[in-house]
């Protein structure tokens, strides 16, 4: 078997790439690795899911695998990914499992695994789980009383809502927010959390039926949210994805406020409050140059991580920093959680609006987004592209043209035979021209 884990767990077409059999065997392997050497007489695992139809099947399979390996399973039901991570720590479980494919279409699904404390797995642990899965010797499984038991955690949602309430920075009375729940895991919780903080809430795409998750809604389809914000005269729109670990925003004019702009607003707020450790924000290589410029002007440093919130988390933990995230809307506040939390991000952004009495458009204007062109180029050999003299020369030429007013990034896809060519410049035509030229050279290698 090739590499199973991607940048955010195991993901694929449910019942084809990701079968019940694979889910069960993966659960047994994960249990063997994550409970090895534990002092717990009886290991426990928290398990939750988003509402997509295949989640019931995969949760049953994972639950069977865990309990067959002697792990007691705590079923928290349909909850966001950050809630599962939080409850893994809160309930002192040995591991946590979230069944979700995040922003992917309904036919896909995925399995995200958390270690004790609610932390995402590092590469070495993922490799160990894959090795256990590939092992030729059958696992030694308990019998009788050694088999794990399964119980529902009836107050799981209330525990997570209480956590969100404790992390809210300001009362939100007087603010109106439209929240797009993507017909996903946030549907029953996000409107409650924002209302509990004092906001007037208008919820859309908050009626999951197992089939409509991410269907023309949520953080990857902002059009309905933009219209709703303008139609209702709302102060802000917030969009979550299927498992609510990300948040994008729409200001009162209907303009999109992406993850970079949200991070800029929160970084400045935390810096003013003395909460931004070492005046440092962790972003990824895909964050817009405009974020770097805005942070430099605000006296804030940026540490750059690889793409993927797990790599942002690694940098946050290594440096002890207090804020990080991605352009896609994954924002991590380590003081309140171990992974991106879309609802928490929305609460903090609304809190900044309430505290400053400034509109979302004014706050977002802290950062000017430079025009960005991204082209996906199909290639035969990603390594050959990275080492190609013609590609290296073309990148150097483009960087000379841009100077300090832009940047070039070539990034191989982690899952496909693609190289992503990204160019930012002060003017869109220049970015497009350079990106087209680079894409042609990359494609010819």
UniProtKB/Swiss-Prot annotation:
Pfam families documented for this protein: PGM_PMM_I, PGM_PMM_II, PGM_PMM_III, PGM_PMM_IV
Phosphoserine found at: 102
Organism per entry: Rhodococcus erythropolis (strain PR4 / NBRC 100887)
Family affiliation: Belongs to the phosphohexose mutase family.
Reaction catalysis annotation: alpha-D-glucosamine 1-phosphate = D-glucosamine 6-phosphate
Name of the protein in question: Phosphoglucosamine mutase
Transmembrane feature ranges: none
PTM per Swiss-Prot/TrEMBL: Activated by phosphorylation.
Binding-site residues, Mg(2+): 102, 241, 243, 245
GO molecular function list: magnesium ion binding; phosphoglucosamine mutase activity; phosphomannomutase activity
A single GO BP: carbohydrate metabolic process
Active site: 102 (phosphoserine intermediate)
UniProt KW Magnesium keyword: yes
Cofactor mode of binding and number, as noted: Binds 1 Mg(2+) ion per subunit.
């Amino acid at each position: 078997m090739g590499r199973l884990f991607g940048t955010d767990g195991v993901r694929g077409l449910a019942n084809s790439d990701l079968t019940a059999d694979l889910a069960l065997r993966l659960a047994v392997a994960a249990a063997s690795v994550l409970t090895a050497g534990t002092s717990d007489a009886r290991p426990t695992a928290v398990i939750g899911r988003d509402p997509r139809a295949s989640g019931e099947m995969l949760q049953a399979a994972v639950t069977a695998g865990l309990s067959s390996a002697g792990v007691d399973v705590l079923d928290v039901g349909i909850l966001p990914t950050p809630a599962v991570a939080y409850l893994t720590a809160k309930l002192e479980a040995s591991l946590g499992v979230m069944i979700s494919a995040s922003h992917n279409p309904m036919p896909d699904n995925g399995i995200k695994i958390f270690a004790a404390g609610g932390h995402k797995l590092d590469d070495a642990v993922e490799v160990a789980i894959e090795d256990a899965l590939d092992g030729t010797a059958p696992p030694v499984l308990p019998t009788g009383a050694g088999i794990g038991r399964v119980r529902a955690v009836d107050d799981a949602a209330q525990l997570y809502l209480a956590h969100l309430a404790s992390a809210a920075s300001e009362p939100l009375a007087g603010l109106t927010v439209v929240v797009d729940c993507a017909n996903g895991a946030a549907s029953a919780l996000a409107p409650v959390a924002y209302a509990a903080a004092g906001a007037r809430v208008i919820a859309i795409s908050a009626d999951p039926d197992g089939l409509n998750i991410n269907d023309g809604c949520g953080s990857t389809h902002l059009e309905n949210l933009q219209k709703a914000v303008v139609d209702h005269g709302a102060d802000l729109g917030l969009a979550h994805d299927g498992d609510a670990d990300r948040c994008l925003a729409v200001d009162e004019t209907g303009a999109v406020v992406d993850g970079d702009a949200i991070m800029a607003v929160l970084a400045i707020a935390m810096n003013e409050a003395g909460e931004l450790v070492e005046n440092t924000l962790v972003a990824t290589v895909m964050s817009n140059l405009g974020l770097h410029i805005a942070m430099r002007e605000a006296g804030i440093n940026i540490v750059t991580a690889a793409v993927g919130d797990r790599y942002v988390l690694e940098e946050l933990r290594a440096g002890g920093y207090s804020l990080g995230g991605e352009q896609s809307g994954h924002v991590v506040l380590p003081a309140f959680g171990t992974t991106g939390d879309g609802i928490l991000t929305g609460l903090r952004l609304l809190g900044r609006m309430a505290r400053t009495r400034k509109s979302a458009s004014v706050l977002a204007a802290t950062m000017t987004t430079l025009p960005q062109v991204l082209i996906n180029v199909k290639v035969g050999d990603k390594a050959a592209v990275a080492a190609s003299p013609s590609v290296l020369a073309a990148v150097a030429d483009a960087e000379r043209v841009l100077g300090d007013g832009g940047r070039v990034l070539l990034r191989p896809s982690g899952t496909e035979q693609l190289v992503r060519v990204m160019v930012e410049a002060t003017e869109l035509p220049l970015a497009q021209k350079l990106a087209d030229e680079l894409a042609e050279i990359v494609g010819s290698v």
